């Protein structure tokens, strides 16, 4: 069983003291191609491309131009699971997971990324900003199409070493479209979270993101390897709701 989640635009590069064996990014050649493309963009072009403020565009420009795709170590990079710090990662709270759970996560959790493609928890990453939905073409393909074959092939390789061949999709649509479901040789299971608002159940972005992190943590901490145990998730008031679920989707409501 492998979980996939989205990355986060917010990143924390404060040093941490750990004794983990860090790993290098999977798709180094593709990263070089992408970062070299991004380095050609001036501040004004970044502002327009990424639909961000001039100040933020300057920060992104600086990040990309200081990016060294041939060097990943503690001087310029940090393990991905401790770096991403958006809503999903607030639910995950990776810095409070024990060592054995982090090591388990290394083989059961993957983060999708516009720049890195697939990221394992202990892969070292440098500061960047490139959402999967960014309107940029690489080798004549939009970003998620550029990554699709590479990511799907790598996932199939990882699953060849897994006993339970189920992909738990806790990523957003923007990122999960970078996986070719038709070419994935395993079962795909979506998970959704809904809130009861005045008698109607709705998916609310900020709550759903944090819940994805909570679910990721639940699966990792409990070493869950089957769907029936995922249904037992009852964190933060969420419970499995069969009325909104089917064989390809588990929905949790509160």
From Swiss-Prot:
A GO cellular-component term linked to this record: cytosol
Family matches, as Pfam families: H2O2_YaaD
InterPro entries: YaaA (IPR005583)
Protein name: UPF0246 protein FTL_1717
Chain coiled-coil ranges: none
Family named by the database record: Belongs to the UPF0246 family.
Domain of life: Bacteria
NCBIfam families: PRK02101.1-3
Record-level GO BP terms: response to hydroperoxide
């Amino acid at each position: 069983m492998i979980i996939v989640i989205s990355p986060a635009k917010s990143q924390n590069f404060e040093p941490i003291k750990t004794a983990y064996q860090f790993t290098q990014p999977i798709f180094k050649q593709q990263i070089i191609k992408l970062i070299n493309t991004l380095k050609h963009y001036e501040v004004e072009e970044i502002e327009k491309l990424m639909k961000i403020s001039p100040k933020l565009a300057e920060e992104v420009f600086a990040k990309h131009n200081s990016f060294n795709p041939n060097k990943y170590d503690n001087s310029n990079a940090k393990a991905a699971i401790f770096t991403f710090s958006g809503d999903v990662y607030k639910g995950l709270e990776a810095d409070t997971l024990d060592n054995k759970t982090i090591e388990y996560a290394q083989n059961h959790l993957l983060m999708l990324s516009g720049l890195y493609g697939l990221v394992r928890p202990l892969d070292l990453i440098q500061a960047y900003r490139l959402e999967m939905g960014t309107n940029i073409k690489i080798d004549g393909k939009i970003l998620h199409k550029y990554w699709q074959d590479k990511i799907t092939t790598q996932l199939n390789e990882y699953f060849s070493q897994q006993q339970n061949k189920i992909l738990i999709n806790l990523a957003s649509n923007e990122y999960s479209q970078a996986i070719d479901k038709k070419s994935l040789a395993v079962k795909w299971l979506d998970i959704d979270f809904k809130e009861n608002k005045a008698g109607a159940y709705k998916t609310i972005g900020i709550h759903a993101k944090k819940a994805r992190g909570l679910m990721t943590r639940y699966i990792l901490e409990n070493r869950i390897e089957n769907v029936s145990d995922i249904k037992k998730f009852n964190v933060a008031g969420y419970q499995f709701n069969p009325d909104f679920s089917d064989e390809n989707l588990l929905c949790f409501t509160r």
